[in-house]
Amino acid sequence: MQTPKLIRPTLLSMAIVSSMAWATGASAALVPPKGYDAPIEKMKTGDHNFTCEAIPKPYTDKLVFRSKYEGSDKARATLNAVSEEAFRDATKDITTLERGVSKVVMQYMRDGRPEQLDCALNMMTTWAKADALESREFNHTGKSMRKWALGSMSSAYLRLKFSDSHPLANRQQDAQIIEAWFSKLADQVVSDWSNLPLEKINNHSYWAAWSVMSTAVVTNRKDLFDWAVKEFKVAANQVDKDGYLPNEMKRRQRALSYHNYALPPLAMIASFAQANGVDLRPENNGALKRLGDRVLAGVKDPASFAEHNGEKQDMTDLKKDPKFAWLEPYCSLYTCSPDVLEDKHEKQPFKTFRLGGDLTKVYDPTHEKGDKGDNDGS
């Protein structure tokens, strides 16, 4: 029989084709979700009142700051006004940079003025050339500031890098300086937040993973992408069968707020993973959806959280619309119910500097309503 001779090369060719397809897929450049390719709205010329704010002094000192929960017990749920003021003073230049980059990139994507692009890039290159935020001397609050800052800047920069208007085409030297700096910071963030015991893995680790995911796409580094996905899976497997995060339940009266605060980085990571062919929604039997549903139910009626940990919930933070910016990526991953969509539309646009600015512009541009909303992310 001649059949086996015919089958053998056919199987071999199939294997070769399969391996070539795998190699092509493996080497495909990392990309953000679709909305990040949006072009600049208008290329405005002529008179303008844009002023580039003074660039804050690059922070090159050790990353050791007081915690705003200083003196609180293990629950870390009681703010210390004195230490919070000290923390905000010490980190002012860092948060000024975060907010500034996010704000100016949003303005540039709206107006397209060269001065705005110059401003945003100068802010980042100034800090990059100073090796800012790279200190190996840090405490928990310090390494937290590093990952927040990286996430804020890299996710704003995504808008420039992937826009169909190609604003960085003639700014490659600046781009290389900025991206090399982001890459170094991401390596340090991975080091800062790796190999923690499960009882220490909470929203901070999720935000660290978001900063690394955003930087992975900016720098096209699959190793960073894989680390962020791995951290997401750890987070997903912390969500219990009822949608609670046990480590955030420890935050007593702030448990619901911290569950809500855990959602933005997780929803963004899942959205970015999806854009690159990795579906994280099934992880731990749909953990992200379970967590989102639990938080949305808790916002409507916080009694379930109070019953679960014995504490009446502090709803102060949950009255701020930008705290629900996670609904943009979340409702792109899942079919949100009509009442959730109605609530989302009432709160839009969602502008939060820790996620790179205006997420409504990226995920739901038909519901963009101009300048409504504070670029809040604190």
Swiss-Prot record:
Residues 1-28 form the signal peptide. One of its GO terms (molecular function) is poly(beta-D-mannuronate) lyase activity. Keywords: Lyase, Periplasm, Signal. It catalyses: Eliminative cleavage of alginate to give oligosaccharides with 4-deoxy-alpha-L-erythro-hex-4-enuronosyl groups at their non-reducing ends and beta-D-mannuronate at their reducing end. Pfam families: Alginate_lyase (PF05426). It is found in: Periplasm. InterPro entries: Alginate_lyase (IPR022859), Alginate_lyase_dom (IPR008397), Chondroitin_lyas (IPR008929). It comes from the Bacteria. Coiled coil: none annotated. Its EC number is 4.2.2.3. One of its GO terms (cellular component) is periplasmic space. The keyword Acyltransferase does not apply. GO terms for biological process: alginic acid catabolic process. HAMAP family: Alginate_lyase (MF_00557). Belongs to the polysaccharide lyase 5 family. This is Alginate lyase. It comes from Pseudomonas syringae pv. tomato (strain ATCC BAA-871 / DC3000). The gene is algL.
